[in-house]
Regions:
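A catalytic-pocket lid/entrance helix-loop region that shapes and gates access to the active site
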Residues: 133-167
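Conserved loop-alpha-helix segment in the C-terminal half of the alpha/beta-hydrolase fold
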Residues: 232-273
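Alpha/beta-hydrolase fold catalytic core
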Residues: 1-38, 59-62, 100-103, 137, ...
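Conserved hydrolase catalytic core segment
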Residues: 102-145
Length: 295
């Protein structure tokens, strides 16, 4: 499938699609005959094309990047369902089973890094390596604010279920909006073919509006630590020098906690912003660092 005005929805890879629990998980595959298998999980409001720049550099690995539910070309979750951090996990396990019966490597960016960590903990020894690009599990549930959090979740759910589809008059309008989320123009355009659909009314955003809503609950700090401890694979944490962890103001504490609870945690600081894996200035070096970790 190709949208001429936006370019290929598969970038430099090949389109794939899996079905789990009635949901379609669309994705992109690079080096289909390669080995080992890398499952790549994108960040919040991104899509599978976010790995298009770095995936070829990970050869000879077979790299499969999936649109999470509500993103890109994948299905939206039903109105009675949610987009909490763990909600994709059962379907991702089913998709992994369809892709490979053997060991896999899991790689995630930002929110996708948190999801990748939970997935790796559940898959146990089947996950041989975990790569986290500028992301950790970094939001905790405060027991004193549980009712407030649930109230926000219910209010946001009603708000975004009622929201009409969003349209952009031009690609420039879409790019301007993405800048607010820390994207440079080229990275925003890279995502456009899976993020947008052309219609007579303009460029319709494919993303489920409910992804903007508050989560029902977050993991507690103790639960986060247990998830970390459950990952049997060695973990590579990649912190962008101008990235989210740096901007959060608590990167050292987060990294210290990760190092304390992961069984094996190596951390590197790499030049670039939060989306460094999409920046051609940095992807060759980043891919080399990842391949060194995998060997």
């Amino acid at each position: 499938m190709t949208i001429d005005f936006l370019g290929s929805v598969s970038g430099s890879g090949d389109a794939i699609s899996c079905r789990a629990d009635g949901l379609i998980y669309a994705g992109i595959e690079w080096q289909p005959e390669g080995d080992p298998v890398v499952i790549a999980i994108h960040g919040w409001l991104d899509n599978a094309l976010s790995f298009d720049q770095i995936a070829p550099g990970l050869s000879p690995c077979r790299v499969i990047s999936l649109d999470l539910s509500g993103h890109g070309l994948s299905s939206w979750r039903s109105p009675d369902s949610t987009y909490n951090l763990w909600d994709d996990i059962p379907q991702l396990v089913a998709v992994v089973d369809q892709i490979s019966s053997g060991p896999i490597i899991i790689m995630g960016h930002s929110r996708g890094a948190a999801i990748a960590t939970i997935l790796a903990s559940i898959l146990g020894d089947r996950c041989t390596h975990l790569v986290l690009i500028d992301g950790l599990i970094n939001a905790f549930n405060d027991d004193k604010n549980t009712v407030d959090q649930l109230s926000r979740f219910v209010a946001d759910r009603q708000k975004y279920l009622a929201r009409e589809a969003r349209f952009f008059d031009s690609l420039d309008d879409f790019v301007m909006r993405r800048r607010a989320f820390g994207f440079d123009d080229s990275s925003a355009l890279k995502l456009a073919s899976r993020a947008l659909e052309q219609s007579s009314a303009g460029f319709r955003l494919r993303t489920d509006p409910r992804l903007h809503g508050a989560s029902a609950l977050w993991l507690s700090e103790a639960q986060r630590d247990e998830v970390y401890a459950g990952v049997t694979a060695p973990v590579l944490g990649i912190c962008a020098t101008e990235g989210l962890l740096t901007r959060s103001g608590v990167p050292e504490k987060m990294l210290t906690e990760a190092g304390r609870h992961f069984r094996q945690f190596d951390c590197i600081h790499h030049a670039g912003n939060h989306h460094l894996h999409m920046d051609p200035t940095h992807t060759a070096s980043l891919a080399d660092n990842i391949k060194t970790f995998l060997t």
